[in-house]
From Swiss-Prot:
Belongs to the 4-hydroxybenzoyl-CoA thioesterase family. DHNA-CoA hydrolase subfamily. GO terms for biological process: phylloquinone biosynthetic process. CDD domains: 4HBT. Catalyzes the hydrolysis of 1,4-dihydroxy-2-naphthoyl-CoA (DHNA-CoA) to 1,4-dihydroxy-2-naphthoate (DHNA), a reaction involved in phylloquinone (vitamin K1) biosynthesis. Signal peptide: none annotated. Keywords: Hydrolase. Its EC number is 3.1.2.28. This is 1,4-dihydroxy-2-naphthoyl-CoA hydrolase. The lineage of its organism: Bacteria, Bacillati, Cyanobacteriota, Cyanophyceae, Synechococcales. GO terms for molecular function: 1,4-dihydroxy-2-naphthoyl-CoA thioesterase activity. The keyword Hydrolase applies. It is an enzyme of class 3 (hydrolase). It comes from the Bacteria.
Length: 151
């Protein structure tokens, strides 16, 4: 583990629905849910102890690129209840390793005691230079392994 936190510290997050994330009816635009998923995953990695620069490419610094890139190869979302401006929501991340080179994260969105949406995003590891499939990085493997220890 990169820090002394428990998995719940990096797998349970919160946010508030902002006005700019909604349409004229005050309900979130559908694509915001997938944006929130990615932001939640980034925050989870940061809370775990992984720096963004160790995981995500930096177009401005070609010399300090991660060897492994993690493009999204599949995503899906289900909406059960509308989310509106000002709603306080909790987001639970449920990572799962699929193979030596891929993993997925299920995101469960809850308002109060009610689940309002769920999404899934799958990533495939590729060599950032050759663009061919490869194994996940040690750091992502550690995040996955320790995330699966949650009760």
């Amino acid at each position: 583990m990169l820090n002394s936190l428990l998995p719940a510290d990096w797998l349970y997050l919160e946010r508030i629905v902002r006005f700019g994330e909604t349409d004229s009816a005050g309900v979130i635009h559908f694509y915001q849910l997938l944006r929130w998923c990615h932001e939640s995953w980034e925050e989870s990695l940061e809370r775990y102890g992984l720096k963004a620069a160790d995981v995500f490419p930096n177009i401005l610094n070609k010399e300090k690129q991660p060897l492994v890139a993690l493009p999204i190869i599949h995503c899906e979302a289900d909406f059960w209840k509308p989310l509106q401006t000002g709603d306080h929501i909790s987001i639970e991340l449920l990572p799962k390793k699929i193979s030596a080179g891929s993993f997925q994260v299920t995101f469960k969105f809850k308002r109060g005691d009610n689940y309002v949406a769920q999404a899934l995003i799958q990533h495939q590891a590729i060599n950032s230079q050759t663009r061919s499939c490869c194994e996940l990085s040690t750091k992502i493997n550690s995040w996955l392994a320790e995330s699966l220890c949650i009760d």
